[in-house]
């Protein structure tokens, strides 16, 4: 397939200007995320139905034309399994494409598995077998090989015609508005940024700690997340999660004690002093300053029975609607609903199972179940 490699600001401006004359475009990104907190953008693929462009972010400095395209309300942006691509756009440009449609969400409303891959979709709709051998390539290395470019180009070349068909099929099936709603919810999830002071709640065994020990974990997790974002490093490359838990549990007072708890040499060398300072700060806190204990949801009274009732309702709705139970409600969504209902976690948005298309489909009977679990 023919493509052009865009390496200049003028070239980007020209292809974005043309793309904005079209009603829809297909987008994809290639990125690297091994030791970093944020994804490192390596390539952007853009197909407007006439011109296929591979945009090299390493050589472009003026991104306003591309941002204007992403925000153009007259141009629908199609991606497949776009969750990580949205994160890339947020990190690189501080915005999300709109209007945005994820074709993986569309096929889920047409009866395919929730994580239906792009290669399988192309095989189904285009009778083409994609070469996925470049999927683990280093997209930050230059120059890009012809094989890399062909691999990247295929992702949008086949996506656009399939997307148009999938919109028609989803509309005919009566699920178009629900699918759009699900795409909006995906965007909302990507914009919900974890507050550092709440990071301790994401630590696996936080529910085992109380009082001063939990206060210490809160300080440690807050510091680690801020440091990871500041240095653009994966959090476990700062200090491993299990080591944070050990420090909070035993409240060490020396570098030697950190080593005895299993912390690595680099962790102690680079961060040992800071960890000990945070432990010392905890020792001077008043009990009134300690965070509330983290409740282990699965041990909460009534959890197992409530979860089972909700799963039964979801299965009934799946059979009635023709949608998969997996699409209707994941375990994570059910757990968030119950945590919200019992006020076990900070209250933010209304849970997804009670809002949007899910709320319209089975929100009332779901509220009926929740009413039995005060």
UniProtKB/Swiss-Prot annotation:
GO terms for cellular component: cytoplasm. This is Ribonuclease D. InterPro entries: 3'-5'_exonuclease_dom, HRDC-like_sf, HRDC_dom, HRDC_dom_sf, RNase_D, RNase_D-like, RNAseD_HRDC_C, RNaseH-like_sf. GO terms for biological process: tRNA 3'-end processing. It is found in: Cytoplasm. Pfam families: DNA_pol_A_exo1, HRDC, RNAseD_HRDC_C. Its EC number is 3.1.13.5. Exonuclease involved in the 3' processing of various precursor tRNAs. Initiates hydrolysis at the 3'-terminus of an RNA molecule and releases 5'-mononucleotides.
């Amino acid at each position: 397939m023919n493509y052009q490699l865009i390496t200049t600001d003028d070239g980007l401006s020209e292809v974005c200007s043309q793309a904005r004359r079209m009603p829809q475009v297909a987008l994809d990104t290639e990125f690297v995320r091994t030791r970093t907190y944020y994804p490192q953008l390596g390539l952007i693929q853009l197909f407007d139905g006439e011109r296929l462009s591979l945009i090299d972010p390493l050589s472009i400095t003026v991104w306003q034309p591309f941002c204007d395209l992403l925000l153009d309300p007259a141009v629908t942006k199609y991606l497949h399994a776009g969750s990580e691509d949205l994160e890339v756009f947020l990190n690189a440009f501080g915005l999300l494409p709109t209007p945005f449609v994820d074709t993986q969400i569309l096929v889920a409303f047409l009866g395919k598995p929730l994580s239906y891959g792009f290669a399988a979709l192309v095989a189904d709709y285009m009778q083409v077998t994609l070469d996925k051998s470049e999927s683990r390539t280093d997209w930050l290395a230059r120059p890009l090989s012809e094989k890399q470019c062909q691999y990247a180009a295929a992702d949008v070349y086949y996506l656009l015609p399939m997307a148009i068909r999938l919109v028609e099929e989803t509309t005919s099936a009566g699920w178009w508005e629900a699918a759009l709603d699900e795409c909006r919810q995906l965007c909302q999830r990507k914009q919900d940024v974890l507050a550092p002071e709440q990071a301790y709640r994401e630590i696996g065994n936080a529910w085992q700690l109380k009082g001063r020990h939990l206060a210490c974990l809160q300080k440690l997790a807050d510091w680690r997340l801020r440091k990871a974002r500041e240095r653009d490093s994966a959090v476990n490359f700062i200090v491993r999660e299990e080591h944070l838990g050990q420090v909070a549990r035993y409240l060490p007072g020396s570098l030697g004690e950190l080593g005895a708890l299993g912390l690595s040499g680099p962790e102690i060398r680079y961060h040992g002093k800071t960890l000990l300072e945070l432990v010392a700060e905890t020792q001077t806190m008043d009990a009134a300053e300690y965070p509330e204990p983290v409740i282990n949801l699965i041990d909460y009274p009534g959890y197992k029975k409530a979860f089972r009732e909700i799963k039964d309702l979801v299965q009934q709705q799946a059979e009635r609607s023709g949608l998969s139970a997996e699409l209707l409600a994941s375990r994570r969504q059910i757990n968030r609903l119950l945590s919200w209902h019992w006020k076990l976690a900070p209250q933010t948005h209304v849970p997804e199972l009670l809002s949007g298309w899910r709320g319209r489909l089975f929100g009332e009977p779901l509220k009926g179940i929740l009413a039995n679990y005060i």
